[in-house]
Amino acid sequence: MIKMNIVFAYPTGLNPQKGGVERITDIIAKILLKRGYTIFYLNWKREQDNYEYPVPVIDLPSSNLEDPNNLEVYNRFLKENRIDVIINQHGLYEGTYFLSQVKVQNVKIISVLHSDPFGYYNHLFADLMTLRDSSIKEKVKRVARFFLYRKVKKIIHRSLVNHYTFI
């Protein structure tokens, strides 16, 4: 069996003490390491911590994914490390388009969705109508949100369609 080179991409550090995605990624990475795969983590908003990561961690130079230097560093990393698979652990969000800009041939991208992409959209009205506090100002804002609901829902729908058509 051919052992692949795999990178897990996530905006922040994949410290298993921080949350569920981080914990699961850490477990999977350790299992794959034991089976002989080469694993890396790629981040663009990682804060320094004291966790001893089991794999090399690559930080993009800027947290702004539109920075051209990030794309150059990203593609050089993929080529130099002969990456076969990119596992995008942030599939619902901003990194998806950036990670797809692979200039190296035969690299597979797997985007993982860790929650329901339409969850917020399906419950938007209830969220918009919830009073944040009992002030007059909040009640006026609630009325404004009521009248803006259709427009906001349309904008969110368009954004979801564009994002998931892309994926």
Located regions from the model:
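Extreme N-terminal starter segment of soluble prokaryotic enzymes
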Residues: 2-7
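Membrane-proximal helix-turn-helix segments that form the acceptor-binding/catalytic region
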Residues: 133-167
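Active-site proximal beta-strand in glycosyltransferases
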Residues: 85, 103-140, 165
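A short, glycine/small-residue-rich beta-strand->loop->alpha-helix junction that serves as a flexible
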Residues: 10-26, 88
